[in-house]
């Protein structure tokens, strides 16, 4: 029976475990604690931290592939596992684009993908340049580690924003500023890609955020024109191919009031 190791024992790993049963596969999970959602149901649990290379090695031993229910695994550890012959999917060279928003924006810019204007923020003085380039207010983001609304600031008071920038840079948090998009709603285009380059997509969904967290998913997205839906799916498949993704990936999108699609973020894991 094929064994797939999933790093992380959260709700996404638990749902993946349920799906694996129907496929005749065993999902092994690396969980930090036996109380985590997937650890409560999986028959194959390795306890340890996703930041611990030895724990990752133990979880990967004998597995046909290693994947994730979150993107927080250090890519340097994954590169070591790759060199040791572990099939890390998606590979760390792709995963970095979901971990680091600056890396993502630069690469998507090279690909010509629709996205907001952005600027790296490396000092408080960069706020002035960003304001001239992006307009005001702009969206300040932590380039790494932010999720579910965390690490995102929209502040109209310049002094308050300067304080946030100084505080975050003082904590060694890399920052970027993005143009504030006037969007109608948020969409998500979910795709899967095989090691051989075959791709498939799910219907585009609408996501509703409350307090920065995804609260409701409507599938398929209501009143989405067929051509816009097809464009979102093709965009997601093209990004997956260009980045070398193997596995599943969600492209989180803004639909503007004029019907344009703007890439917000990438998630290289099962996505709810």
Locate the predicted segments by residue.
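ATP-binding N-terminal substructure of ATP-dependent carboxylate-amine bond-forming enzymes
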Residues: 1-103, 110, 125
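Structural detector of well-ordered beta-strand residues that form the stable sheet scaffold
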Residues: 28, 67, 88-89, 116, ...
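CheY-like receiver
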Residues: 58-59, 107, 129-130, 164-167
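A conserved helix-loop-beta module that forms one wall/lid of the active-site cleft
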Residues: 90-152, 158
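Internal nucleotide-binding/catalytic subdomain
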Residues: 151, 155-251, 255-257
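Conserved protein kinase catalytic/activation segment
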Residues: 259-261
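Glycine-rich phosphate/pyrophosphate-binding beta-alpha loops
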Residues: 267-272
